[in-house]
UniProtKB/Swiss-Prot annotation:
Belongs to the KdsB family. This is 3-deoxy-manno-octulosonate cytidylyltransferase. InterPro entries: Cytidylyl_trans, KdsB, Nucleotide-diphossugar_trans. Its main location: cytoplasm. Activates KDO (a required 8-carbon sugar) for incorporation into bacterial lipopolysaccharide in Gram-negative bacteria. Its EC number is 2.7.7.38. Pathway: Nucleotide-sugar biosynthesis; CMP-3-deoxy-D-manno-octulosonate biosynthesis; CMP-3-deoxy-D-manno-octulosonate from 3-deoxy-D-manno-octulosonate and CTP: step 1/1; Bacterial outer membrane biogenesis; lipopolysaccharide biosynthesis. NCBIfam families: kdsB, PRK05450.1-3, PRK05450.1-5, PRK13368.1.
Amino acid sequence: MSFTVVIPARFGSSRFPGKPLALIDGKPMIQHVVERAKEAGAESIIVATDDERIQNVVEGFAQVCMTSVDHQSGTERIAEVIQTQNISGDTIVVNVQGDEPFIPAENIKQVATNLANAPQCQMATLSTPIVSVADVFNPNIVKVLVNEKGESIYFSRSPIPFERDYMMANPNKANTALYNRHIGIYAYRADYVNQYVNYAPSALEQIESLEQLRAIWYGDKIHCEVAVAPPPVGIDTPEDLERLLETI
């Protein structure tokens, strides 16, 4: 099975400007992401950016596609890459964020393989068990519900499912075994990406501020499975990176 990895990378960030170029062991963060994609066995790896500073650095180790500054999401940026690079419609494209230097290569391969094995689904993504009660109630931790077919039913910043009897009797408590956190990695077939970006934004997507709800709103299916490897801690600030580097 072959697949392409597209890595959207933005320079601008209110909490961590220039994050994709931050150095880790002497290499920019984005280079580590490219290396993880290579380890996963991607046939092609493309960094998609609208910033020349990122372009100038990445050209030394990977293919770069310059994209419009007007995109509102990484998926829109990927759609432009698919169009300008003439990627065939049946190609599996994996969206790996440019600020995930320690993403396990196994997870990249897993999400691509899952989509290849689920022809009834338009997308695939991953989740991981929630072990902290605080995370259940944290709106920055997106929860996902999956049916018996391994298809996502809903994504929410709220605690879903809501275990009525227990949680009403025990406010601010939760049975963590019921909850899974969504991991922000996606696989799609290239022709579906072009379809997706032509959908009008959905009401639920705007309410929750979760773009994957657009697919569910329009009746498309998202395969979801627990990741084979634990996901790394997110890097949102320079302090996050410093703490992470202290642990490796």
